[in-house]
Amino acid sequence: MKTIFCEFLDSQDKNGAIKIKPLGKAKNSVTKPTLPDWKDVVTEIVIDKTYTKGLDGIEEYSHVIVVYWMDKEKECHLKHHPQGREDIPYIGIFACRCPQRPNRIAISTVELVGRKGNIITVKSLDIVNGTPILDIKPYTPQYDEVKNAKVPGWVSKLVF
């Protein structure tokens, strides 16, 4: 089989600014971020039909990593208490998974429920309807699993 090429959706100007165009959008019933009920949310990720062939073979995986842009996030923090909880340490934004980041890029590893054409259905994606999708990658334990990962004790207090 021959490689099928496509055009990049990103670019960088001479000043170093990066532009990224989404390859699709999320479609679900969530209108605003909510905690903690993400585990039951089913989302359709609708990919631009130009990239449908890029999904071929994804059905063989049980989980995918979704990269998306949190376009509805209105605040940018440098330090805070995660989830606004003062019983959690006051930490830097890069020491937590909160959405109030300088670059509103997010990633989530989720269960792949199925695929039909240019649409993949996933479960437990913490995303709002209409959120731009930047990339989809298969979850592969050989690359993504970290054995004996160390995390602070306060993480177990967070609501997921």
Task: List where the protein language model places each region.
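Cys-His-centered catalytic/binding microenvironment captured across papain-like cysteine peptidases
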Residues: 1-107, 114-160
